[in-house]
UniProtKB/Swiss-Prot annotation:
Protein name: Probable metalloreductase AIM14
Residue span, Ferric oxidoreductase domain: 97-213
Bilayer-spanning residue ranges: 20-40, 58-78, 95-112, 133-155, 167-187, 194-216, 221-238
Organism domain of life: Eukaryota
Function, in words: Probable cell surface metalloreductase. May be involved in iron or copper homeostasis.
Source organism per UniProt: Candida dubliniensis (strain CD36 / ATCC MYA-646 / CBS 7987 / NCPF 3949 / NRRL Y-17841) (Yeast)
Main subcellular location of this protein, as a coarse class: membrane
Entry similarity comment: Belongs to the ferric reductase (FRE) family. AIM14 subfamily.
UniProt-listed CDD domains: NOX_Duox_like_FAD_NADP (cd06186)
PANTHER family (UniProt xref): METALLOREDUCTASE AIM14-RELATED, NADPH OXIDASE
Protein backbone atom coordinates (compact mmCIF):
# COMPACT_ATOMS: atom_id res chain seq x y z
CA UNK A 1 0.00 0.00 0.00
CA UNK A 2 1.41 3.40 -0.97
CA UNK A 3 2.39 5.87 1.74
CA UNK A 4 -0.06 8.77 2.11
CA UNK A 5 2.10 11.87 2.28
CA UNK A 6 -0.39 14.70 2.76
CA UNK A 7 -1.79 13.78 6.19
CA UNK A 8 1.68 13.09 7.51
CA UNK A 9 3.30 16.35 6.38
CA UNK A 10 0.29 18.59 6.05
CA UNK A 11 0.97 21.67 3.95
CA UNK A 12 4.66 20.69 3.76
CA UNK A 13 3.80 18.41 0.86
CA UNK A 14 3.35 21.34 -1.53
CA UNK A 15 5.67 23.84 0.12
CA UNK A 16 8.51 23.27 -2.36
CA UNK A 17 6.52 23.86 -5.55
CA UNK A 18 7.17 27.61 -5.49
CA UNK A 19 10.92 27.04 -5.15
CA UNK A 20 10.93 25.00 -8.33
CA UNK A 21 9.21 27.79 -10.22
CA UNK A 22 11.64 30.28 -8.68
CA UNK A 23 14.66 28.37 -10.03
CA UNK A 24 13.01 27.91 -13.42
CA UNK A 25 12.19 31.64 -13.58
CA UNK A 26 15.85 32.45 -12.96
CA UNK A 27 16.87 30.18 -15.85
CA UNK A 28 14.43 32.00 -18.14
CA UNK A 29 15.81 35.37 -17.03
CA UNK A 30 19.35 34.16 -17.67
CA UNK A 31 18.46 32.86 -21.12
CA UNK A 32 16.70 36.06 -22.21
CA UNK A 33 19.47 38.22 -20.76
CA UNK A 34 22.26 36.51 -22.69
CA UNK A 35 20.21 36.38 -25.89
CA UNK A 36 19.72 40.11 -25.61
CA UNK A 37 23.29 41.09 -24.74
CA UNK A 38 24.74 38.94 -27.54
CA UNK A 39 22.42 40.65 -30.00
CA UNK A 40 23.35 44.08 -28.62
CA UNK A 41 27.06 43.25 -28.71
CA UNK A 42 26.99 42.34 -32.39
CA UNK A 43 24.75 45.26 -33.37
CA UNK A 44 26.95 47.78 -31.52
CA UNK A 45 30.06 46.21 -33.01
CA UNK A 46 28.54 46.68 -36.46
CA UNK A 47 27.38 50.24 -35.87
CA UNK A 48 30.48 51.57 -34.09
CA UNK A 49 33.02 49.61 -36.12
CA UNK A 50 34.88 48.72 -32.92
CA UNK A 51 35.05 45.61 -30.80
CA UNK A 52 33.87 46.29 -27.23
CA UNK A 53 35.65 44.39 -24.48
CA UNK A 54 32.91 45.44 -22.06
CA UNK A 55 30.11 43.86 -24.08
CA UNK A 56 32.22 40.79 -24.75
CA UNK A 57 32.71 40.27 -21.01
CA UNK A 58 28.99 40.74 -20.38
CA UNK A 59 28.18 38.21 -23.11
CA UNK A 60 30.73 35.68 -21.87
CA UNK A 61 31.28 36.19 -18.13
CA UNK A 62 33.89 34.02 -16.39
CA UNK A 63 32.59 30.51 -15.87
CA UNK A 64 33.70 30.55 -12.22
CA UNK A 65 31.46 33.56 -11.62
CA UNK A 66 28.42 31.91 -13.22
CA UNK A 67 28.96 28.69 -11.27
CA UNK A 68 29.50 30.53 -7.99
CA UNK A 69 26.30 32.53 -8.43
CA UNK A 70 24.26 29.41 -9.20
CA UNK A 71 25.75 27.49 -6.28
CA UNK A 72 24.91 30.34 -3.91
CA UNK A 73 21.38 30.46 -5.30
CA UNK A 74 20.69 26.73 -4.88
CA UNK A 75 22.31 26.60 -1.43
CA UNK A 76 20.33 29.62 -0.23
CA UNK A 77 17.10 28.34 -1.78
CA UNK A 78 17.66 24.85 -0.40
CA UNK A 79 17.83 26.15 3.16
CA UNK A 80 15.31 28.98 2.91
CA UNK A 81 12.89 29.03 5.87
CA UNK A 82 14.33 25.82 7.31
CA UNK A 83 14.43 26.74 11.00
CA UNK A 84 15.36 23.36 12.46
CA UNK A 85 17.35 21.30 9.96
CA UNK A 86 17.40 18.21 12.19
CA UNK A 87 13.61 18.10 12.00
CA UNK A 88 13.00 19.59 8.56
CA UNK A 89 15.91 18.12 6.62
CA UNK A 90 13.56 16.08 4.45
CA UNK A 91 11.82 19.26 3.27
CA UNK A 92 15.20 20.58 2.15
CA UNK A 93 16.06 17.24 0.51
CA UNK A 94 12.83 17.33 -1.49
CA UNK A 95 13.54 20.92 -2.48
CA UNK A 96 16.98 20.04 -3.82
CA UNK A 97 15.44 17.28 -5.92
CA UNK A 98 12.93 19.70 -7.40
CA UNK A 99 15.61 22.32 -8.08
CA UNK A 100 17.70 19.72 -9.90
CA UNK A 101 14.81 18.89 -12.20
CA UNK A 102 13.96 22.54 -12.82
CA UNK A 103 17.51 23.15 -14.07
CA UNK A 104 17.15 20.51 -16.79
CA UNK A 105 15.46 22.77 -19.39
CA UNK A 106 18.34 25.25 -19.10
CA UNK A 107 20.88 22.46 -19.43
CA UNK A 108 19.24 21.16 -22.62
CA UNK A 109 18.98 24.67 -24.04
CA UNK A 110 22.72 25.19 -23.56
CA UNK A 111 23.54 22.36 -26.00
CA UNK A 112 21.04 23.27 -28.72
CA UNK A 113 22.75 23.96 -32.04
CA UNK A 114 20.61 26.12 -34.32
CA UNK A 115 22.38 26.47 -37.65
CA UNK A 116 23.50 29.64 -39.38
CA UNK A 117 22.45 31.95 -36.52
CA UNK A 118 25.23 34.57 -36.32
CA UNK A 119 23.14 37.04 -34.30
CA UNK A 120 21.96 34.63 -31.61
CA UNK A 121 23.78 33.36 -28.54
CA UNK A 122 22.89 29.68 -29.27
CA UNK A 123 24.36 30.16 -32.75
CA UNK A 124 27.73 30.13 -30.98
CA UNK A 125 26.90 27.03 -28.99
CA UNK A 126 30.55 26.32 -28.18
CA UNK A 127 30.42 29.34 -25.86
CA UNK A 128 27.80 27.49 -23.81
CA UNK A 129 29.62 24.18 -23.40
CA UNK A 130 31.47 25.03 -20.18
CA UNK A 131 28.29 26.31 -18.58
CA UNK A 132 26.47 23.16 -19.71
CA UNK A 133 29.10 20.98 -18.01
CA UNK A 134 28.91 22.95 -14.79
CA UNK A 135 25.12 23.11 -14.81
CA UNK A 136 25.18 19.32 -15.10
CA UNK A 137 27.43 19.17 -12.05
CA UNK A 138 25.09 21.43 -10.10
CA UNK A 139 22.23 19.10 -11.04
CA UNK A 140 24.27 16.15 -9.73
CA UNK A 141 25.05 18.15 -6.57
CA UNK A 142 21.37 18.87 -5.92
CA UNK A 143 20.41 15.27 -6.72
CA UNK A 144 23.05 13.95 -4.31
CA UNK A 145 21.69 16.06 -1.44
CA UNK A 146 18.19 14.86 -2.33
CA UNK A 147 19.31 11.23 -2.30
CA UNK A 148 21.37 11.61 0.89
CA UNK A 149 18.40 13.09 2.72
CA UNK A 150 16.19 10.15 1.85
CA UNK A 151 18.86 7.56 2.62
CA UNK A 152 19.28 9.11 6.08
CA UNK A 153 15.51 9.17 6.57
CA UNK A 154 15.08 5.53 5.58
CA UNK A 155 17.97 4.44 7.79
CA UNK A 156 16.39 6.25 10.74
CA UNK A 157 13.08 4.55 10.02
CA UNK A 158 14.71 1.15 9.53
CA UNK A 159 13.25 1.00 6.01
CA UNK A 160 16.45 1.17 3.97
CA UNK A 161 15.89 -2.34 2.58
CA UNK A 162 12.27 -1.65 1.73
CA UNK A 163 11.41 1.85 0.61
CA UNK A 164 14.11 2.32 -2.06
CA UNK A 165 12.55 -0.57 -3.99
CA UNK A 166 9.02 0.78 -4.08
CA UNK A 167 8.28 1.46 -7.73
CA UNK A 168 8.13 5.27 -7.71
CA UNK A 169 11.12 5.51 -5.39
CA UNK A 170 13.03 2.99 -7.51
CA UNK A 171 12.65 5.25 -10.54
CA UNK A 172 14.54 7.94 -8.65
CA UNK A 173 17.20 5.45 -7.53
CA UNK A 174 17.77 4.35 -11.13
CA UNK A 175 18.19 7.94 -12.33
CA UNK A 176 20.57 8.73 -9.48
CA UNK A 177 22.73 5.71 -10.34
CA UNK A 178 22.90 6.96 -13.93
CA UNK A 179 23.91 10.40 -12.66
CA UNK A 180 26.71 9.00 -10.50
CA UNK A 181 28.08 6.89 -13.35
CA UNK A 182 27.88 9.88 -15.70
CA UNK A 183 29.64 12.13 -13.18
CA UNK A 184 32.52 9.64 -12.93
CA UNK A 185 32.91 8.92 -16.63
CA UNK A 186 32.70 12.63 -17.49
CA UNK A 187 35.99 13.27 -15.68
CA UNK A 188 38.30 14.50 -18.42
CA UNK A 189 40.79 11.58 -18.63
CA UNK A 190 37.96 9.00 -18.65
CA UNK A 191 35.88 10.99 -21.11
CA UNK A 192 38.74 11.21 -23.59
CA UNK A 193 39.53 7.50 -23.45
CA UNK A 194 35.94 6.26 -23.79
CA UNK A 195 34.13 9.19 -25.37
CA UNK A 196 31.62 7.01 -27.21
CA UNK A 197 30.66 5.32 -23.93
CA UNK A 198 30.41 8.69 -22.22
CA UNK A 199 28.17 10.01 -25.00
CA UNK A 200 25.84 7.02 -24.80
CA UNK A 201 25.54 7.21 -21.00
CA UNK A 202 25.07 10.97 -21.23
CA UNK A 203 22.09 10.61 -23.55
CA UNK A 204 20.54 7.71 -21.64
CA UNK A 205 20.84 9.69 -18.41
CA UNK A 206 19.33 12.83 -19.94
CA UNK A 207 16.28 11.05 -21.35
CA UNK A 208 15.86 8.88 -18.25
CA UNK A 209 15.92 11.85 -15.92
CA UNK A 210 13.41 13.80 -17.98
CA UNK A 211 10.96 10.89 -18.31
CA UNK A 212 11.36 8.81 -15.14
CA UNK A 213 11.42 11.73 -12.70
CA UNK A 214 8.10 12.84 -14.19
CA UNK A 215 6.58 9.81 -12.43
CA UNK A 216 8.93 9.80 -9.45
CA UNK A 217 8.38 13.42 -8.36
CA UNK A 218 5.62 14.08 -5.84
CA UNK A 219 4.17 16.73 -6.25
CA UNK A 220 4.41 16.46 -10.01
CA UNK A 221 6.75 18.29 -12.38
CA UNK A 222 4.64 18.00 -15.53
CA UNK A 223 5.25 21.57 -16.72
CA UNK A 224 9.03 21.19 -16.61
CA UNK A 225 8.84 17.72 -18.14
CA UNK A 226 6.85 19.00 -21.13
CA UNK A 227 9.30 21.87 -21.66
CA UNK A 228 12.26 19.49 -21.45
CA UNK A 229 10.69 17.05 -23.92
CA UNK A 230 9.98 19.88 -26.37
CA UNK A 231 13.62 20.96 -26.16
CA UNK A 232 14.84 17.39 -26.64
CA UNK A 233 12.54 17.04 -29.64
CA UNK A 234 13.91 20.26 -31.10
CA UNK A 235 17.41 18.90 -30.55
CA UNK A 236 16.55 15.81 -32.60
CA UNK A 237 15.02 18.00 -35.30
CA UNK A 238 18.21 20.05 -35.58
CA UNK A 239 20.34 16.91 -35.71
CA UNK A 240 18.38 14.95 -38.30
CA UNK A 241 15.73 16.96 -40.13
CA UNK A 242 17.48 20.28 -40.64
CA UNK A 243 20.54 18.52 -42.04
CA UNK A 244 21.81 17.95 -45.59
CA UNK A 245 22.44 14.48 -46.97
CA UNK A 246 25.77 14.01 -48.76
CA UNK A 247 27.63 11.09 -50.29
CA UNK A 248 30.79 10.36 -52.31
CA UNK A 249 33.15 11.91 -49.78
CA UNK A 250 36.78 11.99 -50.89
CA UNK A 251 39.80 11.43 -48.64
CA UNK A 252 43.25 12.73 -49.67
CA UNK A 253 46.36 11.87 -47.68
CA UNK A 254 49.74 10.18 -47.73
CA UNK A 255 50.59 7.27 -45.40
CA UNK A 256 53.36 9.10 -43.53
CA UNK A 257 51.28 12.19 -42.72
CA UNK A 258 49.21 12.68 -39.58
CA UNK A 259 46.69 14.79 -41.51
CA UNK A 260 44.05 14.17 -44.15
CA UNK A 261 42.08 16.36 -46.49
CA UNK A 262 38.38 15.53 -46.74
CA UNK A 263 36.20 16.85 -49.55
CA UNK A 264 32.44 16.78 -49.06
CA UNK A 265 30.08 17.53 -51.96
CA UNK A 266 28.28 20.77 -51.15
CA UNK A 267 24.51 20.65 -51.17
CA UNK A 268 22.79 23.20 -53.39
CA UNK A 269 20.74 24.23 -50.36
CA UNK A 270 23.74 24.72 -48.10
CA UNK A 271 23.80 28.39 -47.01
CA UNK A 272 26.72 30.78 -47.17
CA UNK A 273 28.99 30.63 -44.16
CA UNK A 274 31.46 32.85 -42.38
CA UNK A 275 35.17 31.95 -42.61
CA UNK A 276 36.18 29.69 -39.74
CA UNK A 277 32.70 28.18 -39.43
CA UNK A 278 32.34 24.47 -38.82
CA UNK A 279 29.90 21.75 -39.76
CA UNK A 280 28.92 18.56 -37.98
CA UNK A 281 28.97 15.20 -39.75
CA UNK A 282 26.74 12.34 -38.68
CA UNK A 283 25.53 8.98 -39.92
CA UNK A 284 22.08 8.90 -41.49
CA UNK A 285 19.07 8.39 -39.26
CA UNK A 286 18.68 4.75 -40.37
CA UNK A 287 22.14 3.85 -39.04
CA UNK A 288 22.30 2.58 -35.47
CA UNK A 289 25.53 4.52 -34.91
CA UNK A 290 23.75 7.79 -35.51
CA UNK A 291 21.86 7.22 -32.26
CA UNK A 292 24.75 5.92 -30.17
CA UNK A 293 27.64 8.18 -31.24
CA UNK A 294 28.13 11.92 -31.31
CA UNK A 295 28.11 13.88 -34.52
CA UNK A 296 31.60 15.07 -35.45
CA UNK A 297 32.49 18.76 -35.86
CA UNK A 298 34.91 19.81 -38.60
CA UNK A 299 36.02 23.32 -39.50
CA UNK A 300 35.43 24.21 -43.16
CA UNK A 301 38.66 25.27 -44.86
CA UNK A 302 37.02 26.64 -47.99
CA UNK A 303 35.25 30.00 -48.04
CA UNK A 304 32.14 30.83 -50.12
CA UNK A 305 34.20 33.04 -52.41
CA UNK A 306 36.21 30.00 -53.54
CA UNK A 307 33.21 29.02 -55.70
CA UNK A 308 33.92 25.31 -55.32
CA UNK A 309 31.40 22.50 -55.18
CA UNK A 310 33.04 20.93 -52.14
CA UNK A 311 33.38 21.66 -48.46
CA UNK A 312 37.06 21.01 -47.74
CA UNK A 313 38.25 19.88 -44.32
CA UNK A 314 41.70 19.30 -42.80
CA UNK A 315 41.57 16.66 -40.08
CA UNK A 316 43.86 14.43 -38.10
CA UNK A 317 44.25 10.80 -39.08
CA UNK A 318 41.36 8.53 -38.18
CA UNK A 319 40.52 6.73 -34.99
CA UNK A 320 36.79 6.17 -34.77
CA UNK A 321 34.74 7.84 -37.48
CA UNK A 322 34.89 5.52 -40.48
CA UNK A 323 34.02 6.97 -43.88
CA UNK A 324 32.67 4.70 -46.57
CA UNK A 325 32.50 6.55 -49.92
CA UNK A 326 29.44 4.50 -50.86
CA UNK A 327 27.52 5.59 -47.77
CA UNK A 328 25.49 8.73 -47.22
CA UNK A 329 26.01 11.12 -44.32
CA UNK A 330 24.18 14.00 -42.72
CA UNK A 331 25.77 17.44 -42.54
CA UNK A 332 24.46 20.09 -40.17
CA UNK A 333 25.61 23.66 -40.02
CA UNK A 334 27.21 25.98 -40.65
CA UNK A 335 28.06 27.14 -37.14
CA UNK A 336 30.01 30.42 -36.93
CA UNK A 337 33.05 30.93 -34.76
CA UNK A 338 33.73 34.64 -35.12
CA UNK A 339 30.90 37.16 -35.30
CA UNK A 340 30.23 38.89 -38.66
CA UNK A 341 31.55 42.34 -37.59
CA UNK A 342 35.01 40.86 -37.04
CA UNK A 343 35.48 40.46 -40.78
CA UNK A 344 34.54 44.07 -41.55
CA UNK A 345 36.22 45.89 -38.66
CA UNK A 346 39.53 44.08 -38.00
CA UNK A 347 42.54 46.21 -38.95
CA UNK A 348 45.30 43.70 -38.17
CA UNK A 349 45.02 39.92 -37.80
CA UNK A 350 47.73 37.54 -36.55
CA UNK A 351 46.91 33.83 -36.63
CA UNK A 352 48.85 30.99 -35.01
CA UNK A 353 47.76 27.37 -35.55
CA UNK A 354 49.12 23.99 -34.58
CA UNK A 355 48.52 20.75 -36.49
CA UNK A 356 44.94 20.37 -37.68
CA UNK A 357 44.19 23.79 -36.18
CA UNK A 358 45.21 25.18 -39.56
CA UNK A 359 41.62 24.43 -40.58
CA UNK A 360 40.48 27.47 -38.56
CA UNK A 361 43.28 29.81 -39.53
CA UNK A 362 43.44 29.17 -43.27
CA UNK A 363 39.90 30.29 -44.24
CA UNK A 364 40.22 33.46 -42.14
CA UNK A 365 43.58 34.15 -43.77
CA UNK A 366 42.16 33.56 -47.25
CA UNK A 367 39.20 35.85 -46.54
CA UNK A 368 41.38 38.84 -45.74
CA UNK A 369 43.80 38.10 -48.56
CA UNK A 370 41.06 37.86 -51.18
CA UNK A 371 38.21 40.02 -49.87
CA UNK A 372 39.80 42.62 -47.62
CA UNK A 373 43.41 42.81 -48.76
CA UNK A 374 44.03 46.17 -47.04
CA UNK A 375 44.06 44.41 -43.66
CA UNK A 376 47.53 43.08 -42.67
CA UNK A 377 47.09 39.38 -41.96
CA UNK A 378 49.70 36.76 -41.06
CA UNK A 379 49.31 33.04 -40.55
CA UNK A 380 51.83 30.81 -38.78
CA UNK A 381 51.38 27.05 -38.87
CA UNK A 382 53.45 24.73 -36.68
CA UNK A 383 53.66 20.97 -37.20
CA UNK A 384 55.80 18.19 -35.82
CA UNK A 385 55.66 15.89 -38.83
CA UNK A 386 57.29 17.31 -41.96
CA UNK A 387 55.13 15.04 -44.10
CA UNK A 388 52.06 17.01 -43.04
CA UNK A 389 53.22 19.68 -45.47
CA UNK A 390 51.72 17.58 -48.26
CA UNK A 391 48.56 19.66 -47.87
CA UNK A 392 50.52 22.58 -49.32
CA UNK A 393 50.25 20.78 -52.67
CA UNK A 394 46.49 20.49 -52.34
CA UNK A 395 45.51 23.91 -50.94
CA UNK A 396 46.54 27.49 -51.55
CA UNK A 397 48.94 28.31 -48.70
CA UNK A 398 50.75 31.18 -50.36
CA UNK A 399 52.27 33.43 -47.73
CA UNK A 400 51.68 31.04 -44.81
CA UNK A 401 54.69 30.74 -42.50
CA UNK A 402 55.24 27.03 -41.80
CA UNK A 403 57.47 25.71 -39.02
CA UNK A 404 58.41 22.05 -38.57
CA UNK A 405 59.26 21.64 -34.90
CA UNK A 406 60.54 18.04 -34.93
CA UNK A 407 64.03 18.29 -36.35
CA UNK A 408 65.74 15.29 -37.84
CA UNK A 409 64.66 12.22 -39.77
CA UNK A 410 61.26 12.69 -41.37
CA UNK A 411 60.24 9.15 -40.50
CA UNK A 412 56.99 9.53 -38.57
CA UNK A 413 57.94 6.98 -35.92
CA UNK A 414 61.24 8.69 -35.18
CA UNK A 415 59.53 12.03 -35.10
CA UNK A 416 57.02 10.70 -32.62
CA UNK A 417 59.90 9.78 -30.30
CA UNK A 418 61.33 13.27 -30.66
CA UNK A 419 58.10 15.07 -29.88
CA UNK A 420 58.57 15.30 -26.14
CA UNK A 421 62.05 16.80 -26.46
CA UNK A 422 61.35 19.77 -28.71
CA UNK A 423 59.94 22.98 -27.18
CA UNK A 424 58.01 24.85 -29.81
CA UNK A 425 57.67 28.53 -29.05
CA UNK A 426 59.81 31.36 -27.77
CA UNK A 427 58.03 34.46 -26.57
CA UNK A 428 60.32 37.46 -26.88
CA UNK A 429 63.69 36.38 -25.45
CA UNK A 430 62.79 33.58 -23.05
CA UNK A 431 65.43 31.04 -22.09
CA UNK A 432 65.27 27.92 -24.25
CA UNK A 433 64.97 25.70 -21.21
CA UNK A 434 61.74 27.52 -20.39
CA UNK A 435 60.07 26.45 -23.64
CA UNK A 436 56.53 25.25 -23.14
CA UNK A 437 56.62 22.14 -25.29
CA UNK A 438 53.51 23.02 -27.25
CA UNK A 439 51.60 20.52 -29.33
CA UNK A 440 52.73 17.61 -27.16
CA UNK A 441 49.13 16.38 -27.18
CA UNK A 442 47.77 17.90 -30.34
CA UNK A 443 45.09 15.27 -30.78
CA UNK A 444 43.79 15.72 -27.26
CA UNK A 445 43.16 19.44 -27.10
CA UNK A 446 40.15 21.36 -28.43
CA UNK A 447 36.61 20.61 -29.48
CA UNK A 448 36.02 17.06 -30.54
CA UNK A 449 37.16 17.29 -34.15
CA UNK A 450 37.36 13.59 -34.84
CA UNK A 451 39.12 12.37 -37.93
CA UNK A 452 38.25 9.94 -40.63
CA UNK A 453 40.03 6.91 -42.06
CA UNK A 454 40.60 6.38 -45.72
CA UNK A 455 39.05 3.50 -47.58
CA UNK A 456 40.99 0.69 -49.26
CA UNK A 457 40.56 2.37 -52.62
CA UNK A 458 41.92 5.64 -51.32
CA UNK A 459 44.76 3.84 -49.53
CA UNK A 460 45.81 2.22 -52.80
CA UNK A 461 45.70 5.57 -54.55
CA UNK A 462 47.80 7.11 -51.79
CA UNK A 463 50.42 4.35 -52.03
CA UNK A 464 50.69 4.72 -55.79
CA UNK A 465 51.44 8.42 -55.46
CA UNK A 466 53.69 8.13 -52.42
CA UNK A 467 56.93 8.44 -54.41
CA UNK A 468 55.62 11.59 -56.08
CA UNK A 469 54.68 13.01 -52.70
CA UNK A 470 58.17 12.31 -51.38
CA UNK A 471 59.58 14.31 -54.27
CA UNK A 472 57.09 17.09 -53.59
CA UNK A 473 58.10 16.97 -49.95
CA UNK A 474 61.69 17.76 -50.87
CA UNK A 475 60.54 20.63 -53.07
CA UNK A 476 58.40 22.04 -50.27
CA UNK A 477 61.38 22.42 -47.94
CA UNK A 478 62.08 25.84 -49.39
CA UNK A 479 58.65 26.96 -48.19
CA UNK A 480 58.98 26.01 -44.51
CA UNK A 481 61.48 26.34 -41.72
CA UNK A 482 62.72 24.00 -39.02
CA UNK A 483 62.60 25.08 -35.40
CA UNK A 484 60.48 27.31 -33.25
CA UNK A 485 58.82 30.54 -34.37
CA UNK A 486 59.20 33.64 -32.22
CA UNK A 487 56.01 35.66 -31.93
CA UNK A 488 57.80 39.00 -32.11
CA UNK A 489 59.43 37.96 -35.38
CA UNK A 490 56.62 36.15 -37.20
CA UNK A 491 54.06 38.80 -36.25
CA UNK A 492 56.31 41.81 -36.74
CA UNK A 493 54.47 44.78 -38.22
CA UNK A 494 55.66 45.39 -41.78
CA UNK A 495 55.60 49.16 -41.35
CA UNK A 496 56.61 50.07 -37.76
CA UNK A 497 55.43 53.65 -38.27
CA UNK A 498 51.84 52.48 -38.73
CA UNK A 499 49.58 52.57 -35.69
CA UNK A 500 46.54 50.36 -35.33
CA UNK A 501 43.39 50.60 -33.24
CA UNK A 502 44.00 48.00 -30.53
CA UNK A 503 40.25 47.37 -30.19
CA UNK A 504 40.33 45.94 -33.71
CA UNK A 505 43.77 44.30 -33.61
CA UNK A 506 43.51 40.54 -33.22
CA UNK A 507 45.44 37.42 -32.38
CA UNK A 508 43.71 34.14 -33.26
CA UNK A 509 44.99 30.81 -31.97
CA UNK A 510 43.88 27.27 -32.63
CA UNK A 511 45.58 24.23 -31.19
CA UNK A 512 46.55 22.75 -27.84
CA UNK A 513 46.48 24.43 -24.45
CA UNK A 514 50.12 25.51 -24.40
CA UNK A 515 49.93 27.17 -27.79
CA UNK A 516 46.78 29.01 -26.77
CA UNK A 517 48.29 30.07 -23.45
CA UNK A 518 51.40 31.53 -25.06
CA UNK A 519 49.44 33.29 -27.80
CA UNK A 520 47.08 34.76 -25.22
CA UNK A 521 49.97 36.06 -23.13
CA UNK A 522 51.66 37.63 -26.15
CA UNK A 523 48.37 39.18 -27.22
CA UNK A 524 47.71 40.59 -23.75
CA UNK A 525 51.20 42.08 -23.51
CA UNK A 526 50.53 44.07 -26.68
CA UNK A 527 46.94 45.01 -25.95
CA UNK A 528 45.49 42.97 -28.84
CA UNK A 529 42.12 41.24 -28.80
CA UNK A 530 42.29 37.48 -28.56
CA UNK A 531 40.17 34.62 -29.89
CA UNK A 532 40.95 30.92 -29.65
CA UNK A 533 39.62 27.45 -30.26
CA UNK A 534 41.07 24.27 -28.87
CA UNK A 535 40.22 20.96 -30.42
CA UNK A 536 39.08 18.50 -27.77
CA UNK A 537 36.10 16.48 -26.56
Amino acid sequence: MEEVVVPRHGDHHNINIKYGFFIFALTIIQTIFFLQVKFIQIKRWNSTGRFSKFWSQITNPPIWLMVTVWLLIVIFTGGHKISDFSEEYIISAKRYGRMAYCLIPLNIYLVLRPTNSPLLKPGYYLENMSLHKWTSRIIVFCSTIHAAGYVYKWIKEGAILNKPFRFLNLLGVVVFVFLVVLAIISIRPFRRKVYSTFYLIHNVTAWSMVILITFHARPGVTVFAVISLILLGYQLYLRYYSSYMVNSLKVIDIPTSTLQIIKIPQSNKFPNWLPGSHIRLNYTISKFKSWTTASHPFTVVTIPEDSTNNLTLIVRKPNSFVINPLDSYLVTGPYPSLAPPFFTTANIVNIICGGSGISLGLPIYHHFKSINSTVPVKLVWTIRNQNDTFIMNQLDMTGVQVYVTSIGDTNSEQQENQQQAVPLFVIEEEEEEQGHGLLNNDNENGIELQNMPKTNEESSEANSTNSKNNKDNQERKEYFKFGRPKFDEVFAIDDPTTTYDLDNSWVIACGPDELISDAKRWSKDRGYRFYYEKYEM
